[in-house]
UniProtKB/Swiss-Prot annotation:
The lineage of its organism: Eukaryota, Viridiplantae, Streptophyta, Embryophyta, Tracheophyta. It comes from Arabidopsis thaliana (Mouse-ear cress). InterPro entries: Aminotrans_3, Aminotrans_3_PPA_site, PyrdxlP-dep_Trfase, PyrdxlP-dep_Trfase_major, PyrdxlP-dep_Trfase_small. Residues 22-32 have a biased composition (Polar residues). One of its GO terms (molecular function) is pyridoxal phosphate binding. This is Alanine--glyoxylate aminotransferase 2 homolog 3, mitochondrial. The keyword Ligase does not apply. GO terms for cellular component: mitochondrion. Homotetramer. One of its GO terms (biological process) is photorespiration. It is found in: Mitochondrion.
């Protein structure tokens, strides 16, 4: 009786009519139809959130697209078949022009660390704006030195001197220049599949053809990528590091300026370096007179969960650390931190950055550090990220389309392949899944050289319920393929 009542209720709720006399539909077909309808109604449910945005009265998506095409660079591109018009954001959620809420699992490309519009960061910026937002570092202001002091307290060894920039590209440009000035050498080693920026020197260090223009990019040698999934030596980090030795011996004078590498490759598809690689590579480079640069633009600021800085999980201490993105929670800010000895090379000439270290940005950065500490977001990234990775791994066991699940904390990657043995990139399937997940309220990023990797880098306030919702949506979308 209860089953019949439930079926009748389902039929009524979906405006189904029982077949009239003479209908060709069989009882089995009717039961199948009910089951399909019941399945369709069981879409994953987004966790509750105590905020609703006010009505949006700005330009429509169509108007924005028209202006973008007319006035902005044609190099700009967007995700999704139907572009998303984001008009407001709170913590781990963003809202479109219709007030619809989405779970942001991309975090502005690993940039939103504390959460969208975190009140502590917003209040610090507003407070500073009411005092002074910019003058010049030629005058004194306590915000830049206060933030620098707090920042170096998170770093090991003799990493005690800070230079502020506006972006990760700027930070890496400065770091590479300092390495060359300090050593008196020009050659730098970076990794294949890496991304370090798109200016003159950093484009040379970047090693993906789809991010490189045909301009002069001299003095950089790209070593074999220590990729445990696609690499030729599997997870043997020391074997990969031998290529750094060979590059130095056969491609340079035997002396180099340095090595630059991400702790986890971000744009390259959330690739964790093979265990043992960085200690071996650092040792080889230092024996050749070079310094070691850790690019922490994406993996820094507690994102990997187990450590505040990504390089710490490899057991190394760099000579120079670069950072951006999560440092300001969306405010344009970057930095280079190095030793007093290396920092001294910039005193040979005048070095200046107009906006680097301005009061507003450094007030934001200082607030980010406070929030990360007070709200224990590193611990949260470890807890939620570990849970999310476990659930994604279970999903891999369910679907052949998933070739690899990797990463640490809330910096995770899911690589899609058409064939697990051949590892043929499933680029079209990746795009389709992204679109389907967006329709169900989940936003993820995309990366990897072949464009077949989900980049999952949400704000660090991401919850266990958010993680479950993401996986449930992904599971539902994949079940329909």
């Amino acid at each position: 009786m209860r089953k019949l009542t439930a079926v009748n209720s389902l039929l009524k709720r979906n405006n189904y009519l029982l077949p009239r006399h003479g209908s060709s539909q069989t009882a089995a077909q009717r039961t199948s139809s009910v089951r399909e309808t019941e399945t369709e109604t069981k879409l994953p449910k987004m966790p509750p959130f105590n905020y609703s945005p006010p009505p949006y009265d700005g330009p429509s998506t169509a108007e924005i697209i028209a202006k973008r095409r007319e006035f902005l660079s044609p190099a700009l591109f967007h995700f999704y078949n139907t572009p998303l018009n984001i008009v407001e954001a709170k913590m781990q959620y963003v809202f479109d022009e219709n007030g619809r809420r989405y779970l942001d699992a991309f975090g502005g490309i690993a940039t939103v660390s504390c959460g969208h519009c975190h009140p502590e960061v917003v209040n610090s910026v507003v407070k500073q704006l009411k005092l002074i937002n910019h003058s010049t570092i030629l005058y004194l202001n306590h915000t830049i030195s206060d933030f620098a002091e707090a920042l170096v307290s998170t770093l090991p060894g003799d990493l005690k001197v800070v230079f502020f920039t506006n972006s990760g590209t700027e930070a890496n440009e400065l770091a590479m220049m300092m390495a060359r000035l300090y050593t008196g050498c020009n050659d730098i080693v970076s990794l294949r599949n890496s991304y370090h920026g798109n200016a003159a020197a950093t484009m040379g260090a970047t090693a993906q053809s789809n991010w490189k223009f045909n301009v002069v990019q001299s003095g950089v040698h790209h070593a074999i990528n220590p990729d445990p999934y696609r690499g030729i030596f599997g997870s043997d980090g020391e074997k990969y590091a031998s290529d750094v030795h060979d590059l130095i011996q056969f491609g340079t004078s035997g002396q180099v300026a340095g090595f630059i590498g991400e702790s986890i490759q971000g744009v390259g598809g959330i690739v964790e370096l093979a265990p043992g690689y960085l200690p071996a590579a650092y040792d080889i480079v230092r024996k050749a007179g070079g310094v070691c640069i850790a690019d922490e633009v994406q993996s820094g600021f507690a994102r990997t969960g187990t450590h505040f800085w990504g390089f710490q999980s490899h057991g190394v201490i760099p000579d120079i650390v670069t950072m951006a993105k999560g440092i300001g929670n969306g405010i344009p800010l970057g930095a280079v931190v190095t030793t007093p000895e290396i920092a001294g090379v910039l005193s040979r000439r005048s070095y200046f950055n107009t906006f680097g270290g301005n009061p507003m940005c450094t007030a934001a950065g200082h607030a980010v550090l406070r929030v990360l500490h007070e709200e224990k977001l590193q611990e949260n990234a470890n807890l939620v990220g570990s849970h999310l990775k476990r659930r994604l791994t279970l999903l891999k066991n369910k679907y052949e389309l998933i070739g690899d699940v990797r990463g640490r904390g809330l910096m995770l990657g899911v690589e899609f392949v058409k064939d697990r043995d051949l590892k043929t990139p499933a680029k079209a399937e990746t795009l389709h899944l992204m679109d389907q997940m967006k329709e169900m309220g989940v936003l993820v990023g995309k990366g990897g050289f072949y464009g077949n990797v989900f980049r999952i880098t949400p704000p660090l306030c991401f919850t266990l319920s958010d993680a479950d919702f993401l996986v449930d949506v992904m599971d539902h979308a994949m079940s329909k393929m």
